[in-house]
């Protein structure tokens, strides 16, 4: 679980052992971690977690210890920095064990760390521009990646890197001013 701490405030990561909650605040480096947004569990190792930070980049946690903070310095510049901080909106593992990353307000806003430990990314700026990427949803059936933005649009990327932009208000009876989340109907109805 995460103690949400917006606006550049430090935040704690807690783990539960079945009886007690333990903070990672006593772990070296924890006191510099800010603006945690979400955590994803490695499907191949439940004690291996990745967290997205709207300040630091991608935080790697293993056996309740922070073991790495990924940013432009250790990802071959795949994770890019907005002028004053990293803006990682979401991290998720796909069915193949690749870590997918939504990196907001940069040229390559959709990044990945594949299961071979290779970094890569897809250009999103021509679609998204300076609009913030607010979140990411992975389609479990057709493997589309959906990134929703602060300008009320949804960028859809397929496995070949092809992209389309969806406007949720085209054809909608009730217009929306902002996409807050995207979920998938798992039984296809």
Language-model features, listed with the residues they occupy:
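Carboxylate-rich, polar loop motifs that coordinate divalent cations or form catalytic acidic clusters
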Residues: 1-189
């Amino acid at each position: 679980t995460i103690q949400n701490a917006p606006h550049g405030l430090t935040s704690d990561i807690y783990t539960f052992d079945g009886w007690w909650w333990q903070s990672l605040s006593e772990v070296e480096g924890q006191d510099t971690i800010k603006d945690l947004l979400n955590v994803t569990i490695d499907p191949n190792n439940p004690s291996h977690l990745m967290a997205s930070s709207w300040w630091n980049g991608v935080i790697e946690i293993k056996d309740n210890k922070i073991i790495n903070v990924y940013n432009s310095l250790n990802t071959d510049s795949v994770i890019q920095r907005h002028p004053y901080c990293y803006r990682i909106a979401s991290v998720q593992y796909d069915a193949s064990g690749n870590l997918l990353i939504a990196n907001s307000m940069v040229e390559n806003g959709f990044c990945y760390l594949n299961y071979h430990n290779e970094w890569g990314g897809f250009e999103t700026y021509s679609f998204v521009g300076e609009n913030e990427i607010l979140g990411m949803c992975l389609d479990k059936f057709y493997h589309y990646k959906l990134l929703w933005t602060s300008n009320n649009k949804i960028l859809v990327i397929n496995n070949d890197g092809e992209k389309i932009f969806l406007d949720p208000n085209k054809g909608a009876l009730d217009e929306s001013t902002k996409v807050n989340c995207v979920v998938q109907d798992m039984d296809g109805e």
